[in-house]
């Protein structure tokens, strides 16, 4: 949740589309089980219907914000040895969707990622790198804003520097179709994700200790678990959900691993909620202390949206050579 991967990630899938990924299952319309319960049949092959569900997944379609939470473990993976749990992490995000005149949605958010002690859960300011034996300063992620557009067609990739807000509708547009699975009697699943290979904004010549190399290789995968009754209830402005998130990415720059072989694996669980009670008290205390402006999602589009790596390059300074 820290930077763009491709047009088929969270950065793009709900805003750009998963039409390029073949759906696992396009199930027939789900049937209401309770007599007298009004249901709106699912239309998995309809791009406009998919756009509306994507917006409902992100926030309330009446303009109310939703809180997103993700908790998990940051693992280190190196060749020739077993992986190890390095850190815990907590994501705090506020998300709002606003319908545009063309019927599509501006999806607007702010997000913070805290790194925590995997045993105590306490947010860290410093971390002892077990690979190097060096104590390093932890750099939390704070993205304000991180926005994209949820359309009924596949838009441009949400990559650094790409214009995604105001684009003409392409003549040969590809329909926006989420990747649905009819999972169980009560649950449907949206799967999204992608793989990327793009230039590293931390030039290794300038950032020898922070940069893993001239290119970034990353993968990001999400699964949203949704109650099928909620999906077919057209009066619900938001689709509450739980999910799992996996991200494979180079070493975090503040770990000061340089071009050491290996990578990071984020392993997390996420959910949505309507109040701050959705979070651990310690997380809210940290947000109130350091990032109070993140408690409220944007109400209108502004930008640019800058990834965590871009923020690092703009706000940090290269670490001195290790003595």
Mark where each language-model region is.
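Predominantly extracellular/secreted and cell-surface proteins with exposed
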Residues: 82-231
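N-terminal secretory signal peptides
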Residues: 1-9, 21-23, 33
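C-terminal segment of N-terminal export signals and the immediately downstream linker at the start
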Residues: 27-57
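Edge beta-strand at a domain terminus
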Residues: 242-323
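Domain-length functional cores that host ligand/cofactor binding and catalytic or interaction surfaces
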Residues: 192, 198-199, 203-218, 223, ...
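Short, solvent-exposed loop/hinge segments that bridge or flank secondary-structure elements
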Residues: 47-59, 63, 69-101, 125
